[in-house]
Amino acid sequence: MTIPGTILDTARTQVLEQGIGLNQQQLMEVLTLPEEQIPDLMELAHQVRLKWCGEEIEVEGIISLKTGGCPEDCHFCSQSGLFESPVRSVWLDIPNLVEAAKQTAKTGATEFCIVAAVKGPDERLMTQLEEAVLAIHSEVEIEVAASIGTLNKEQVDRLAAAGVHRYNHNLETARSYFPEVVTTHTWEERRETLRLVAEAGMEVCSGGILGMGETLEQRAEFAVQLAELDPHEVPMNFLDPRPGTPFADRELMDSRDALRSIGAFRLAMPHTMLRFAGGRELTLGDKGSEQALLGGINAMIVGNYLTTLGRPMEDDLDMMDRLQLPIKVLNKVI
């Protein structure tokens, strides 16, 4: 039972009934809820998700067009060419991308996201991505999203014209903590790309990684900054420390804090798709993942991630079936 007068009581009126997200101060109260109130938080977040987003879960597969060799120094990422990590630079050709899209579609996924480890695309990458999107759309009934770094207006317009329906560019963390995570570019550069994406009519996808050493105040700050984007989708990653990176020795996020964060992000963004992404297997395990799917999450990446292993996609599909969570069906508008 929710205790009257608590932040959950406030959220029930403000978020569930009115669809208005919590502010930063209110989110701090959510992030510091006692452990015994986490089930109440999950229940409320699930009710908010059902009312404002519906009951369906969107499933997505991702693939890396270009892996490794990135010139940026994102401290969590093994794809940086500046760190002594085991990841090496690899390019995929278009036939392999089309085949991967076909395999993704067979799982029931409605979206296939093509990712490249770059600060921003050069002409070679832009051309290959445009050709890949056209090739995939000609053979596979699936939406194509992309994540290839910082873009200028011309590049944004080209991707929109090619048929990219959603663009991912994560803010990664709160503006105040960003300099502790990345030093080779700014938070503002990322924000500007997202502004251009929205202006071009593509759906905005932006999230980040929790558990990188940010304070609870910065976690609440991050949720509000994401909400200000009015994003279609927010991927929620949890730090999976990668060998050779500056964050290699960071501890995993506590599972209870992860659940509080999921609930808080749902209460900050009642209308937004919250997508389970990297690190959930280590941070939450099977039980925690099930709690989160009944506590505000309404989308998942299935299969492996960019440089880390996920769960077998069959296990995730079985989990959704066991929880009686319907998978979103792709609706084509003609």
UniProtKB/Swiss-Prot annotation:
Pathway named in the protein's UniProt entry: Cofactor biosynthesis; biotin biosynthesis; biotin from 7,8-diaminononanoate: step 2/2
The protein, known as: Biotin synthase
Alphabetical GO biological process terms: biotin biosynthetic process
Keyword Metal-binding set for record: yes
Function comment: Catalyzes the conversion of dethiobiotin (DTB) to biotin by the insertion of a sulfur atom into dethiobiotin via a radical-based mechanism.
Keywords: 2Fe-2S, 4Fe-4S, Biotin biosynthesis, Iron, Iron-sulfur, Metal-binding, S-adenosyl-L-methionine, Transferase
Radical SAM core domain mapped to chain residues: 55-280
Family matches, as NCBIfam families: bioB
Cofactor note: Binds 1 [4Fe-4S] cluster. The cluster is coordinated with 3 cysteines and an exchangeable S-adenosyl-L-methionine.
Cofactor(s) the protein requires to work: [4Fe-4S] cluster; [2Fe-2S] cluster
Binding site for [2Fe-2S] cluster: C113, C205, R275
EC number, as in UniProt: 2.8.1.6
Signal peptide, first to last residue: none
Catalysed reactions listed for this entry: (4R,5S)-dethiobiotin + (sulfur carrier)-SH + 2 reduced [2Fe-2S]-[ferredoxin] + 2 S-adenosyl-L-methionine = (sulfur carrier)-H + biotin + 2 5'-deoxyadenosine + 2 L-methionine + 2 oxidized [2Fe-2S]-[ferredoxin]
Top enzyme category: transferase
Subunit description: Homodimer.
Molecular function per GO: 2 iron, 2 sulfur cluster binding; 4 iron, 4 sulfur cluster binding; biotin synthase activity; iron ion binding
InterPro entries tied to this protein: Aldolase_TIM, BATS_dom, Biotin_synth/BioAB, Biotin_synthase, Elp3/MiaA/NifB-like_rSAM, rSAM
Family: Belongs to the radical SAM superfamily. Biotin synthase family.
Gene that this polypeptide is encoded by: bioB
Residues the record lists as binding [4Fe-4S] cluster: C70, C74, C77
Cystine bridges: none
Pfam families, per the entry: BATS (PF06968), Radical_SAM (PF04055)
SMART domains: BATS, Elp3
